[in-house]
């Protein structure tokens, strides 16, 4: 997940944060494993990354892999 976040430009990070209702700083913490995404944020990130990051990647405790 960190590699995905690091591959985005600052502008793309800001756009993604805006789309999911968060901030780039908070998403950086989520993608680096310092914070857990809420179940709603995990679903939004999966949607807006077109599945590059799945809700199972972010919250395997809530969304186990199939």
UniProtKB/Swiss-Prot annotation:
Superkingdom: Bacteria
Classification via InterPro entries: Lambda_DNA-bd_dom_sf
Gene Ontology molecular function, alphabetical: DNA binding
Miscellaneous note of the record: This protein is part of the e14 prophage present on the genomes of E.coli K12 MG1655 and W3110.
Name by which UniProt lists this protein: Prophage transcriptional regulatory protein
Source organism of the structure: Escherichia coli (strain K12)
